[in-house]
């Protein structure tokens, strides 16, 4: 009995996922360690720089928990979108096999990055909890929905830049450049309410602001972020994914044969 298209894709993605693990980490344990060290280093540096100031301005909020719920979502977005851009070149030889499609490589990479950073998030949240910092997951559903939309958004952005970058290779260099200022305007190091309201209309166009603030709301009792919206995040994500899939559909054959 012939397998359905979904079953074929599932098997393909599983094989690509295992290949990504071997490629990403190989035989070296340091690869797994680096996944923990990178966000930990960011956390420690920002705690050292802003810890005292933020403790004075937000005395009832755990600053390590506040930071973690900004850093990890940004790392998920950055890692999935960046690694999606180079997915074709890294797996070019596999496209000789008929079942393997470029979009499968993005799904496999997104799954791996998600598992890595969810594990890192849980581990670091446990560490700060054992260190005496308080948090409580008051809205687990909101947290899951927010992060799910974040992952889909990251895939959509990666898909757009992968397709466009295949036609115009210089575009592959644009995404890393765009991510640098995003780090500073996504409310990672500061709460939205610390910004004068006249500037909110500009910041709130950025979907990562909604991701970060909604994540904090879900795990920090009493933290309410005015202005952010799960509906806006969902709409932005779906539009981005639609554009990515539309571009991919028109260029899939060209990407496979180039």
Swiss-Prot record:
Top-rank taxon, per record: Bacteria
GO cellular component: ATP-binding cassette (ABC) transporter complex
Annotated coiled-coil segments of the chain: none
Localization in the cell: Cell inner membrane
TM region positions: 33-53, 61-81, 110-130, 144-164, 175-195, 227-247
Signal peptide from the UniProt entry: none
PROSITE patterns per the UniProt record, alphabetical: ABC_TM2
Molecular functions (GO terms): ABC-type transporter activity
Family matches, as InterPro entries: ABC2_TM, ABC2_TM_bact-type, ABC_2_transport
Function: KpsM and KpsT constitute a system for the transport of polysialic acid across the cytoplasmic membrane.
Family named by the database record: Belongs to the ABC-2 integral membrane protein family.
Protein name per UniProt: Polysialic acid transport protein KpsM
Species name: Escherichia coli
């Amino acid at each position: 009995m012939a397998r359905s298209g979904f079953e074929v894709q599932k098997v393909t993605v599983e094989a690509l996922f295992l290949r990504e693990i071997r490629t990403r980490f190989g035989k070296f344990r340091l690869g797994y360690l680096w996944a923990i060290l990178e966000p930990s280093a960011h956390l420690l540096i920002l705690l050292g720089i802003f810890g005292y100031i933020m403790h004075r301005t937000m005395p009832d909020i755990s600053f390590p928990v506040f930071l973690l719920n900004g850093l990890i979502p940004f790392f998920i977005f950055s890692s999935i979108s960046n690694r999606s851009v180079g997915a074709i070149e890294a797996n070019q030889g596999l496209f000789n096999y008929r079942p393997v499609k470029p979009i499968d490589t993005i799904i496999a990479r997104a799954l791996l990055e998600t598992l890595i950073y969810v594990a890192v998030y849980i581990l670091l949240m446990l560490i700060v909890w054992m260190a005496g910092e308080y948090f409580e997951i008051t809205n687990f559903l909101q947290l899951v929905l927010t992060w799910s939309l974040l992952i889909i958004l990251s895939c959509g952005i990666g898909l757009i830049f992968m397709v466009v970058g295949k036609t115009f290779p210089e575009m592959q260099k644009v995404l890393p450049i765009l991510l640098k200022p995003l780090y500073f305007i996504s409310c990672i190091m500061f709460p939205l309410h610390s910004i004068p309201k006249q500037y909110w209309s500009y910041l709130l166009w950025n979907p990562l602001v909604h991701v970060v603030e909604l994540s904090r709301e879900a795990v920090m009792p009493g933290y309410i972020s005015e202005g952010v919206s799960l509906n806006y995040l969902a709409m932005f994500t779906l539009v981005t994914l639609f554009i990515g899939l539309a571009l991919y559909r028109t260029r899939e054959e060209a990407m496979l044969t180039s």
